[in-house]
Amino acid sequence: MHYPKVYDVIVIGGGHAGTEAALAAARMGRQTLLLTHNIETLGQMSCNPAIGGIGKSHLVREIDALGGAMALAADKGGIQFRILNSRKGAAVRATRAQADRVRYKAAIREILENQANLDIFQQAADDLIVEGDTVKGVVTQMGIRFDAKTVVLTTGTFLGGVIHVGLEKSSGGRAGDPPSIALAQRLRELKLPVGRLKTGTPPRIDARSVDFSVMTPQPGDFPSPVMSFMGDVSMHPEQVNCYITHTNEKTHDIIRGGLDRSPMYTGVIEGVGPRYCPSIEDKIHRFSDKDSHQVFLEPEGLDTHELYPNGISTSLPFDVQFELVRSIRGMENAHILRPGYAIEYDYFNPQALKFTLETKAINGLYFAGQINGTTGYEEAGAQGLLAGLNAARRAWEQEEWTPKRDQAYMGVLVDDLITLGTKEPYRMFTSRAEYRLMLREDNADQRLTTIGRELGLVDDVRWAAYCEKMEAVERETSRLQHLWAAPNNPMGKKFVEMTGADLSKECSAIDLLKRPNINFGQIAELTGSEVSQQVGEQIEIAVKYEGYINRQHEDVAQLKRLEETKIPADFDYDVVSGLSREITQKLKTVRPETLAQASRIPGVTPAAVQLVMITIRKNNMTKKTA
């Protein structure tokens, strides 16, 4: 059957990348189709039931600032909230939400089903319709043809997915779901640069069989933080504890004894696993000097006894899993509800993508999520939103948009993937961003919501809330600049009495806030401020970090000069005099779009960038005189 409706955007896959891609395109007014193999698994958390964390929550806030769904779903489904790095600087603080899987998934589905311009269809995609070098649509498993101006692929771990438990293996996209074999084969036929990666998940445990009395409880923070700029604590369901226990030497001996049947250590698995989320087999091998590792027992939801034992991801045979779980303190009688497993899947070298996440080889075809070599819900969601918005803009022949490294962690993510490529699952960290003081979790809305509004991603309700917040920040900052404390006036005396600090000369309330040991709460009490905590936090960070932020702005200004120098798509690196063969090959492989991107390619020296710049200028001069 040839479906009669022609779509602007078709999104294949209903995971974290796919849902954000479909929602972004539909919010922008494009006729959008979301194809999923199972409507019941839309927004499914395939592994850890948590959103956020170091570096990751910055991405979640950026998705939220652009009108995305992930943060709001985390607020509606979160059963424990914590601020990580709370004693460190604002740049590296991160919010983490332990989520109820069912509530999170329900929140995502509700948003999808109520989004205008979005159709959902349950059917696996088996083929892409490609005419010449342009994608024209999709053919489903039943042979239904859907035509579209653009297609976004967000296939997660489903492309050629193989599940491993010990030396036994089976085809699967995740436990209980079939893989995408036909689509994987079709993509290989298109000569896209394919590789294999691996990820894994731990066995799930029945909480009724666990002795929590010998474990350390880990409560959430109070007052509870929120994930979304539009969120509120009233959205949160009941809050619960997680628990901490540890592996021991007996556990490690059991694991070592099973390595001869490990698919990772017998060469059965060829794909590379995530460096920053290693299996328990990897941990005892790589950190052999450690006699124990932490295990976090995390509830999967409020209406289930299922626990996620974070820290013991494994693909060992089930009998070894059984023994290793029962060797851990408090889990001596543990019942395993689901075995742990590893999954191996196809991914495509992200260096074959444009910065818009469109493939260089096929016009109108976009990739997002694990297909690009990343790991994590947050990284997937960020790519999905960018791919969705750019597919939407291409469909209407509008200029596409991707944030720069100084604008967003999304920009860092995309630039890293396309400039550097990846041979292992890529995870975001704050350390990957040069301008992290400017790219904080708390100011994602200030960086991106205005842009999102211009792109058509931000609705009237979110825009009004953002404008109201920024007006409150401006009003309160101005008020504090005009309130003065002096050694002999009432406000000055109250300040000294409250804080025990010295006050030798007249200062504005803003100047008092600049002091390292003074926080906004104290200034609010001193001056009778009634603004929200969010507004107060913005003012405090802006005041305390003003000097550092100004210096980063100067660094960005220097970088922009390189960013503004575009390298023509057909630029011939072979004619650049003085370039080494090695650097020439690297530049030809990556095909950087700007001098700034060229400068970030490993092994490309500043002198080489200078040579490229000189050649570009010579070429431009030649064209002008021709």
From Swiss-Prot:
Where can this protein be found?
Answer: Cytoplasm
Q: Name one GO biological process term.
A: tRNA methylation
Keyword DNA damage: yes or no?
Answer: no
The residues that hold FAD are: G13, G14, G15, H16, A17, G18
Cofactors that this protein relies on: FAD
Q: InterPro entries attached here?
A: FAD/NAD-bd_sf, GIDA_C_N, MnmG, MnmG-rel, MnmG-rel_CS, MnmG_C, MnmG_C_subdom, MnmG_C_subdom_sf
Q: Give the CC-aspect GO terms.
A: cytosol
Give UniProt keywords alphabetically.
Cytoplasm, FAD, Flavoprotein, NAD, tRNA processing
On whether Ligase is a keyword of this UniProt record, the answer is: no
* Listed transmembrane segments: none
Q: Which top-rank group of organisms is this from? A: Bacteria
Question: In which broad location class does this protein mainly occur, judging by the first location in its UniProt entry?
Answer: cytoplasm
Q: Which SUPFAM superfamilies match?
A: FAD/NAD(P)-binding domain
The entry's NAD(+)-binding residues are: 273-287
What are this entry's molecular-function GO terms? flavin adenine dinucleotide binding
List the Pfam families hit by this protein, alphabetically: GIDA, GIDA_C_1st, SAM_GIDA_C
Quaternary structure per UniProt? Homodimer. Heterotetramer of two MnmE and two MnmG subunits.
Q: What's this protein's function?
A: NAD-binding protein involved in the addition of a carboxymethylaminomethyl (cmnm) group at the wobble position (U34) of certain tRNAs, forming tRNA-cmnm(5)s(2)U34.
Record's family? Answer: Belongs to the MnmG family.
| Protein known as | tRNA uridine 5-carboxymethylaminomethyl modification enzyme MnmG
Q: Report the source organism.
A: Acinetobacter baumannii (strain SDF)
Q: What lineage is this protein's organism placed in?
A: Bacteria, Pseudomonadati, Pseudomonadota, Gammaproteobacteria, Moraxellales
